[in-house]
A protein has these predicted regions:
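His/acidic metal-ligating clusters that form di-metal
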Residues: 1-82
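Binuclear metal-dependent phosphoesterase catalytic core
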Residues: 72-125
Length: 125
């Protein structure tokens, strides 16, 4: 089974089961600024990106979370958020090493980046 078919099947199952919050995690970001931006080392190639984005939009996926760029970044394509999280060990931008906590609740998806030096003792989930 291809990744594309897996994604279609999984999101169809989520829809059939009444899943309200749908998110997608991937190593490489789909895009950094715009869904129609050019190809590059840090993003999924456009020809593959379009196929994936069409599926995600068709199934009302709200957020895509990725890494690979070693910087924090946020962009949108319609209602879809593209959230890139910086590295824990070797950040390339101005953001310090850290991690992102993603919370999925009935009313939606929230996320927050924590620098390693600023991690709280506990995080309410």
């Amino acid at each position: 089974m291809s990744i594309v078919q897996f994604l279609k099947d999984d999101l169809s199952t989520a829809r059939a089961n009444g899943c309200e919050a749908k998110i997608f995690f991937t190593h490489h970001p789909l895009f950094l600024e715009r869904a129609d931006e050019g190809d590059g080392y840090f993003v999924i190639p456009r020809v593959r990106r379009k196929v994936i984005l069409d599926i995600l939009h068709e199934h009302d996926v709200s957020s895509v979370f990725a890494g690979h760029w070693h910087r924090n970044n946020h962009a949108e394509d319609g209602k879809l958020q593209m959230v890139v999280t910086g590295a824990v060990g070797y950040p390339l931008g101005d953001d310090p090493s850290g991690l992102r906590v993603v919370k999925v609740r009935g009313d939606g998806v929230t996320h927050k980046y924590y620098a390693m030096d600023d991690l709280p003792d506990s995080i309410a989930l």
